[in-house]
Curated annotation (Swiss-Prot):
Cysteine disulfide partners in this protein: none
Keyword Signal in annotation: no
Gene Ontology MF, one: rRNA binding
Name the UniProt record assigns to this protein: Large ribosomal subunit protein uL3
The organism's taxonomic lineage, starting at the top: Bacteria, Pseudomonadati, Campylobacterota, Epsilonproteobacteria, Campylobacterales
Swiss-Prot/TrEMBL keywords: Ribonucleoprotein, Ribosomal protein, RNA-binding, rRNA-binding
Family: Belongs to the universal ribosomal protein uL3 family.
Function noted in UniProt: One of the primary rRNA binding proteins, it binds directly near the 3'-end of the 23S rRNA, where it nucleates assembly of the 50S subunit.
Pfam families, A to Z: Ribosomal_L3 (PF00297)
One GO BP annotation of this record: translation
GO cellular component, one term: cytosolic large ribosomal subunit
Chain ranges passing through the membrane: none
Subunit structure, as described in the record: Part of the 50S ribosomal subunit. Forms a cluster with proteins L14 and L19.
């Protein structure tokens, strides 16, 4: 079973020793159409964007204006209606997929953990990349060479244990951290 979630932030349990936890809000979603093999077309609310294509889908599936986004998910529902969140109550582990924090154009020390050069005694190397290849052979930069560039803002999937699930408020508490900023949007999949 898959669910759409929004990251609330991190906290910790009151027990001794305390456990670091991440809070996720399970988004309200409506199953529009069951597609077979356990998958379904699901509508959810995000922002206020709307165009004629979205309005046509809202009319077709008799949805209110707030449900303006669509996704294909594995669901427990056998028919159209509100998405069933009951499987989360019995779940033990989930796979969480979110975008990591974007860090922009970053140097090799931050992006790839390069050691850098000496900072004193007249050195100019400091945080620079240094040599990126040999001389006549191979006469080019090898593919996959670690260099400065865009860091972060990529999809990452991790597995976490479920600590608790508040079905009334749809808040899922996971052990440990997950990628992404507070308010990040992603999806979870029940593993077992």
């Amino acid at each position: 079973m898959e669910f759409l979630v929004e990251k609330i932030g991190m906290s910790r349990t009151i027990s001794v020793p305390s456990t670091p936890v991440t809070l996720l809000k399970v988004k309200d979603a409506k199953v529009c159409e069951v597609l077979g093999n356990g998958k379904a077309l699901v509508a959810y609310a995000q922002g206020k964007d709307a165009n004629k294509a979205i309005e046509g889908q809202q009319k077709k599936y008799n949805l209110s204006k707030e449900f303006n986004r669509f996704a294909t998910l594995e669901v427990a529902n056998g028919e159209a209606g509100d998405q069933d969140v009951a499987p989360l109550a019995q779940a033990v582990r989930v796979k969480v997929s979110l975008q990591t924090k974007g860090r922009g154009f970053t140097g090799v020390m931050k992006r790839w953990n390069f050691a850098g050069g000496p900072a004193a005694h007249g050195h100019r190397f400091k945080r620079r990349t240094g040599s990126i290849g040999n001389r006549e052979w191979p006469g080019r930069v090898q593919p996959g060479k670690k260099m400065a560039g865009q860091y972060g803002n990529e999809k990452v999937t991790v597995q976490n244990e479920i600590v608790s699930f508040d079905a009334e408020n749809k808040i899922l508490v996971l052990k440990g951290s997950i990628p992404g900023f507070n308010g990040a949007f992603g999806r979870i999949k029940v593993v077992k």
